[in-house]
């Protein structure tokens, strides 16, 4: 199983890292490392994230790297990270193509 970002998911992740980096480079590195560790775990356990409570009928799951939520979908042998949202935000319905 491979973990990949959709273009919009990658853009959002990089924007978050850049935002944190402006004020606290060490925190940005820690966040990026924690995210990589959590996402790497999905390679072996793709169903380990919880179903999105806001969209229980959709085929999306999430893993949390506080305070951010990584939304993903398993398609074949790939885990697609489709969105990254701050936990305080109300998410929009994720889309695979993003």
Map each language-model feature to its residues.
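Basic, Lys/Arg-enriched alpha-helical interface segments
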Residues: 2-60, 78, 92, 96-98
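Enriched for short, Lys/Arg-rich terminal
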Residues: 65-98
